[in-house]
Amino acid sequence: MTIQDVSSSGLSKRILGVTTKRRHELLSQLESNYFYILDWAKNVTDIKEQYPLLPLSETLSIAANIGIIHPQDPKNKEPIVMTTDFYIEVQKGMGVEYQARTVKPSNQLDDKRTIEKLEIERQYWQRRNISWGIVTERDIPLEIVKNLKWIRICVDWDALDLSEYEILQAKKLLSQNLTQRNDSLTSICADCDRELGLKTGCSLAIVRNMLQTRELLVDLHQPIHPRKKLVITKTQF
């Protein structure tokens, strides 16, 4: 299923998953925000979005049994395949667990028709003994989302034109200065660029990559401001 297959509010976007190494099509800002959280979670091993509830005959049967109208194509009134926003694979000890999650703004949960469609979803996943739940904006910490958006960067190491040795030296120097100095992140990165003879911006890109790969750990509940000190809680260097 693609973005073109579903009506959207104009906030749809495609995001490359760090966990999955593939592009995901998210249909709203709320879905995107939740995706960032899932993609960061260490125990999440796969994420599928707009997961189809098949066979269609099963959701039709559920709707008939509870006496509600199954979702239809507004043009021809034919029943359509329902979807759950996220189908997630989660590592649990030596095994895996599957979870289904529907993302909805909290102000839609009082709508009668929305509740009816959610009940079809709930019963569909209940039959499969798969955990199903609703995620609203109240469950998504926005400060963490903002930070995750900022640190997500696909570094083009070829464009930076750095050897593995230069990258390692930069990581060591940045880690040392970030933990020992009280200067802003941009100031420390600029100093590292000058000291190691790197192109302007190289060190900042490396820091963002180190945050993404967890070589540097920070409290993501606290806002990251490049012009302020970046408080490191743990480093691999």
Where are the model-predicted features located?
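Electrostatic, structured charged patches in enzyme active sites and in nucleic-acid/phosphate-binding
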Residues: 1-237
